[in-house]
Amino acid sequence: GAFIMPGTLWCGAGNAASDYSQLGTEKDTDMCCRDHDHCSDTMAALEYKHGMRNYRPHTVSHCDCDNQFRSCLMNVKDRTADLVGMTYFTVLKISCFELEEGEGCVDNNFSQQCTKSEIMPVAKLVSAAPYQAQAETQSGEG
């Protein structure tokens, strides 16, 4: 089965929630993941979109969604949120995409040759910056 972070239903590969309103015990972190899962502009593995094919084995999201996800997790300020943030941005280094004006193929005539291209927003991958942990370390620990 897919890996879901303990205490959450939405953090990890896929989700374990039966409906949108359902959240795990780590509610705040789970809400960040749920919002990110519902990003309005994503590219599934091997999908061709915005003039680019996503050759990664996972979905990539528009950078606006990833930036919002990062801020959301950082505002939770607990260890679960940090673990999710570190896993996604620092360990897995999941890229996001931004749209830039460029030349994209609109008709490739079912061959490798592009027969018609035009100026359109074209996706460009952006590498993830490492996540900065936010949980306060307890004084007198470690």
Curated annotation (Swiss-Prot):
Tissue specificity as recorded in UniProt: Expressed by the venom gland.
Names of the cofactor(s): Ca(2+)
Residues where Ca(2+) binds: 10, 12, 14, 37
KW Disulfide bond (keyword) present: yes
Chief location category: secreted
Gene3D superfamilies reported in the protein's UniProt record: Phospholipase A2 domain
Disulphide-bonded residues: 11-33, 32-72, 39-65
Substrates-to-products reaction catalysed: a 1,2-diacyl-sn-glycero-3-phosphocholine + H2O = a 1-acyl-sn-glycero-3-phosphocholine + a fatty acid + H(+)
Places the protein is found: Secreted
Co-factor: note: Binds 1 Ca(2+) ion per subunit.
Keyword tags: Calcium, Disulfide bond, Hydrolase, Lipid degradation, Lipid metabolism, Metal-binding, Secreted
Record-annotated active site: 36
GO cellular component: extracellular region
Transmembrane segments: none
Presence of keyword Glycoprotein: no
Family membership noted in the UniProt record: Belongs to the phospholipase A2 family. Group III subfamily.
PANTHER family reported in the protein's UniProt record: RH14732P
Biological role: PLA2 catalyzes the calcium-dependent hydrolysis of the 2-acyl groups in 3-sn-phosphoglycerides.
Designated name of the protein: Acidic phospholipase A2 PA4
Organism: Heloderma suspectum (Gila monster)
